From Swiss-Prot:
Keyword presence, Metal-binding: no
Region described as HA2: spans on this chain: 462-553
Gene: Dhx33
Enzyme class name: hydrolase
Compositionally skewed regions (Gly residues) per UniProt: 30-40
Short sequence motif named Critical for rDNA-binding, residue ranges: 536-550
Any GO CC annotation of this UniProt entry: NLRP3 inflammasome complex
Functional summary from the UniProt entry: Implicated in nucleolar organization, ribosome biogenesis, protein synthesis and cytoplasmic dsRNA sensing. Stimulates RNA polymerase I transcription of the 47S precursor rRNA. Associates with ribosomal DNA (rDNA) loci where it is involved in POLR1A recruitment. In the cytoplasm, promotes elongation-competent 80S ribosome assembly at the late stage of mRNA translation initiation. Senses cytosolic dsRNA mediating NLRP3 inflammasome formation in macrophages and type I interferon production in myeloid dendritic cells. Required for NLRP3 activation induced by viral dsRNA and bacterial RNA.
Record PTM text: Ubiquitinated, leading to its degradation by the proteasome. Deubiquitinated by USP36.
Name under which the protein is recorded: ATP-dependent RNA helicase DHX33
Entry-linked PROSITE patterns: DEAH_ATP_HELICASE (PS00690), HELICASE_ATP_BIND_1 (PS51192), HELICASE_CTER (PS51194)
Length: 698
């Protein structure tokens, strides 16, 4: 087990309070300011609880949130500011309450209040919660818009949406005219969409002011962030600190570096489990679904053989692609005599609040994207968290009472962590970003006002990729979109998948390609519990295609549709029914976009070669060939890669494949593979492969 930190941790860490050495612009405490908050206007009255016990409970919960007593102060300040940065820890109530306070204060009279979220699940669940609190049907006063789903109406005044969806709206209206206020929530996550949105919203606010239009209020919210950077970027915006209910947290570090963080986490969990009262729950941070499912199984197996007197253990995994009904279990109390052990990805860092957590076990690892513009490879890699992420994880232990965090790394190791997480825009493929900016008619993408500028190499690599996909042309020393590029931008997809759909009519397989792209656009439709691996493999045999994962997924979807989306069938075949229904919705919307473009929609009628040819013509930059020693290397850069164990091709050795993504753990794995002929690739991009071949020879 880790040893205790040398300094009293409670003194070192109080999320929500002002970090040492930083200038405080304003301090809003949850212990005061319940009246008018010093503002000249009267604070608008809150709705009174209704007779319904559920409504009454909601209203009581709302009034008990840390933010409630600062309501008057907050509203008085926000009314008079064009820009504000608000810091308040997870669970303070800022995300659900600030939009309501602004609405109750009349901010929405001249336009909608938008609240952006990095995650689809958060946008939907928050909109549902706020509509309940406002006693209105979801989609009326309060609604949400996420990719492929719009639950709003003409009456909507508070709108939760993913940052990517607000970006898509900016393509058709760069001034965001329908909004009076944009709240950029979870800003610290710095996703690729969030960073682009910062620049788009800032530009819209400036242009509206220059044109004498309705002012746009911008509020940036987070549990933690580099406030100086955000304040400077948004025109020296005042920073409002909102204190919450954080309790003291003891922090323990390991004495020695851990070679196997998974084993260290397992040992820590069972040591806590055998010593702590059953009512105190444990939250463990791991990096991804496979690790989480494997550890969940191991914990359950070990828990069955513990001595008498030990509490029972309820092990609950938590990750984005887990079926929604199973995600909800982490918020429910454990049965009497049971301890909840939640094993989660970084989704539990800030996006959600889980009650009952006394102990946090932090492995200090996370799975994040990395991009190499020279090789053109974008991989998911397991790496160290930043100090900011480590503090966020620690803070999960102090929500309701004092807590304990076990950091499975030494204090010296922690001191070497990066202070902040590198923004995604500086470590990702930027092809989607450049396509969107050009669709918004940004005059020069190289000089766009990014908060953290990507390297010129990354931008140039993205431009080169879009060029290869036929999306760009150079006119009067300016980059513009070709007709194909404009069509690609109309799809809410990565450029390569948009191009796949556009090419499908040439290969007479649009129906099949629409299904495959839709399947790749949602979280995994397959559920693979490690404890039932043999059973999973047995029932899936009937769907497997030797032509690859894409065709296998296509077979599963077709059967799902043929049996009418039967839930029992989904359960028997380990298919996530909710995600499969979402695939059907996504497909319908993509098909509608095709029809608007007057694209002929044809089926290959069982001819899978035409489907694979189409994939080869759009994914030619993601190809690998079998080497003489039986290994694989990417066709263009000769990077060694391997077929992922989850692929239906894992035990096969096709000569040439295209893949959808790369995952780096102990080696670089290809995921979602399709068998292709090398000839098709040279047919798709002869100049590209000639150039690569010449470089390789030199």
């Amino acid at each position: 087990m880790p040893e205790e930190a040398s300094l009293p941790p409670a003194k070192r860490f109080r999320p929500g309070s002002c970090p040492p050495g930083r200038r405080v612009v304003m301090l809003l405490t949850a212990g005061g300011g319940g009246g008018a908050g010093g503002g000249r206007r009267q604070t608008p009255p809150l709705a009174q609880p209704s007779a319904s016990p559920y409504r009454e409970a909601l209203e009581l919960q709302r009034r008990s949130l840390p933010i409630f007593r600062a309501r008057g102060q907050l509203l008085a300040q926000l009314r008079n500011l064009d820009n504000a940065v608000l810091i308040g820890e997870t669970g303070s109530g800022k995300t659900t309450q600030i939009p309501q306070y602004l609405y109750e204060g009349g901010i929405s009279r001249q336009g909608i209040i938008a609240v952006t979220q990095p995650r689809r699940v958060a946008a939907i669940s928050l909109a549902t919660r706020v509509s309940d609190e406002k006693r209105t049907e979801l989609g009326k006063l309060v609604g949400y818009t996420v990719r492929f789903e719009d639950v709003t109406s003409e009456d909507t005044r508070i709108k939760f949406l993913t940052d990517g969806m607000l970006l898509r709206e900016a393509i058709s209206d760069s001034l965001l005219r329908k909004y009076s206020c944009v709240i950029l929530d979870e800003a610290h996550e710095r996703t690729i969409h969030t960073d682009v949105l910062f620049g788009v919203v800032k530009t819209a606010q400036k242009r509206r002011k220059e044109l004498g239009k309705l002012p746009l209020k911008v509020i940036v919210m987070s549990a933690t962030m580099d406030v100086d950077l955000f304040s400077q970027y948004f025109n020296r915006a005042p920073v409002l600190y909102l204190e919450g209910r954080q309790h003291p947290i003891q922090i323990f570090y390991t004495k020695q570096p851990q070679q196997d963080y998974l084993h260290a986490a397992l040992v820590s969990v069972f040591q806590i489990h055998q010593e702590a009262p059953a009512s105190q729950d444990i939250l463990v941070f791991l990096t991804g679904q496979e690790e989480i499912e494997a550890m969940s199984k191991t914990c359950r197996d070990i828990a069955r053989h513990l001595p008498d007197g030990c509490p029972s253990m309820l092990v609950l995994p938590l990750y984005a692609s887990l079926p929604y009904s199973q995600q909800l279990r982490v918020f429910q109390g454990a049965p009497k005599g049971y301890r909840k052990v939640i094993i989660s990805t970084n989704i539990a860092e800030t996006s959600i609040t889980i009650t009952g957590i006394k102990y946090v076990v932090d492995t200090g690892m996370v799975k994040a994207k990395k991009y190499n513009p020279d090789s053109g490879l974008e991989v998911l890699a397991v790496q160290r968290v930043s100090k900011t992420q480590a503090w966020q994880r620690t803070g999960r232990a102090g929500r309701e009472d004092s807590g304990i965090c076990y950091r499975l790394y030494t204090e010296d190791e922690f001191e070497k962590f990066e202070k902040m997480t590198v923004p995604e825009i500086q470590r990702c493929n930027l092809a989607s970003v450049i396509l969107q900016l050009l669709a918004m008619k940004v005059p020069n993408v190289l000089t766009f006002d990014f908060m953290s500028k990507p390297s010129p190499d990354h931008i140039e690599a993205a431009i080169a990729q879009l060029d290869l996909l036929g999306a760009l042309e150079h006119k009067d020393d300016q980059l513009t979109l070709t007709p194909i590029g404009r069509k690609m931008a109309a799809f809410p997809l990565e450029p390569r998948f948009a191009k796949t759909i556009l090419l499908s009519s040439k290969f007479h397989c649009t129906e099949e390609i629409l299904t495959i792209v839709s399947l790749l656009s949602v979280d995994s439709v397959l559920y693979n519990p490690p404890a039932r691996r043999d059973e999973v493999q047995s029932v899936r045999k009937k769907f497997i295609s030797s032509e690859g994962d894409h065709i296998t997924l296509l077979n599963i979807y077709r059967t799902f549709k043929n049996i009418g989306g039967n839930k029992d069938w989904c359960k028997e075949n380990f298919v996530n029914s909710k995600n499969m229904l979402l695939v059907a919705e996504v497909r319908a919307q993509l098909r509608e976009i095709c029809l608007k473009m007057s694209m002929p929609i044809m089926s290959s009628r069982g001819d899978m070669e035409s489907v694979r040819r189409c994939m080869a013509h759009s994914l030619f930059m993601n190809t690998a060939e079998l080497q003489t020693d039986g290994t694989y290397a990417t066709t263009d850069t000769h990077q060694p890669v391997a077929i992922h164990p989850s692929s239906v091709l894992f035990h096969c050795k096709p000569a040439c494949v295209v893949y959808t993504s790369l995952l780096y753990t102990n080696k670089c794995y290809m995921r979602d593979l399709c068998v292709v002929d090398a000839e098709w690739l040279y047919e798709a991009a002869p100049d590209y492969f000639r150039r690569k071949l010449r470089t390789a020879r030199n």
